[in-house]
C-alpha cells in the first residue's frame, strides 16, 4: 500500500527544485499523488475498507491544500506541475 523508499527518492529527484530538496510543494504533491494512486488501486479489491478510505480523504485534502498554496504563490509552477502529474483540476 505505501510507497517504497526507492520510489520516494525517485520522486524527490524527479520533482526537486534543487539538490536535496524534499520540502518544496512540488515534491510533496508528487509523493501524495503516488500514495493516492496506490490507495485507489487498493480500493478496487477492498471496497469495504472504510478506515483506509478516511486516510485517502485526508491525503486528498492535504494535496488540495498544497495545490492551493502553490497556485497562490506561483501559478506557472502550479500549471506545470498539474500538467506533469496529469491531475485534472
UniProtKB/Swiss-Prot annotation:
Q: Name one GO biological process term.
A: translation
- Superkingdom, taxonomy of origin: Bacteria
Example of a GO MF term: rRNA binding
Alphabetical list of PROSITE patterns matching this protein: RIBOSOMAL_S15 (PS00362)
**Which CDD domains does this chain map to?**
Ribosomal_S15p_S13e
Which Pfam families does the record cross-reference, listed alphabetically? Answer: Ribosomal_S15
Q: Which GO terms describe its cellular component?
A: cytosolic small ribosomal subunit
SMART domains given for it?
Ribosomal_S15
SUPFAM superfamilies per UniProt: S15/NS1 RNA-binding domain
Gene3D superfamilies documented for this protein = 6.10.250.3130, S15/NS1, RNA-binding (1.10.287.10)
Q: Which UniProt keywords apply?
A: Ribonucleoprotein, Ribosomal protein, RNA-binding, rRNA-binding
Question: What is the stated purpose of this protein?
Answer: One of the primary rRNA binding proteins, it binds directly to 16S rRNA where it helps nucleate assembly of the platform of the 30S subunit by binding and bridging several RNA helices of the 16S rRNA. Forms an intersubunit bridge (bridge B4) with the 23S rRNA of the 50S subunit in the ribosome.
Give the multimer and partner information.
Answer: Part of the 30S ribosomal subunit. Forms a bridge to the 50S subunit in the 70S ribosome, contacting the 23S rRNA.
Q: Which family does it belong to?
A: Belongs to the universal ribosomal protein uS15 family.
Q: What is this protein called?
A: Small ribosomal subunit protein uS15
Q: Which gene encodes it?
A: rpsO
Amino acid at each position: 500500500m505505501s510507497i517504497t523508499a526507492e520510489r520516494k527518492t525517485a520522486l524527490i529527484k524527479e520533482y526537486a527544485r534543487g539538490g536535496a530538496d524534499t520540502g518544496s510543494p512540488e515534491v510533496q504533491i508528487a509523493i501524495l499523488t503516488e500514495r493516492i494512486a496506490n490507495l485507489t488501486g487498493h480500493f478496487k479489491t477492498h471496497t469495504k475498507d472504510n478506515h483506509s478510505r478516511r486516510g485517502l480523504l485526508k491525503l486528498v485534502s492535504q494535496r488540495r491544500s498544497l495545490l492551493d498554496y502553490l497556485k497562490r504563490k506561483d501559478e506557472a509552477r502550479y500549471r506545470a506541475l498539474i500538467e506533469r502529474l496529469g491531475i485534472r483540476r
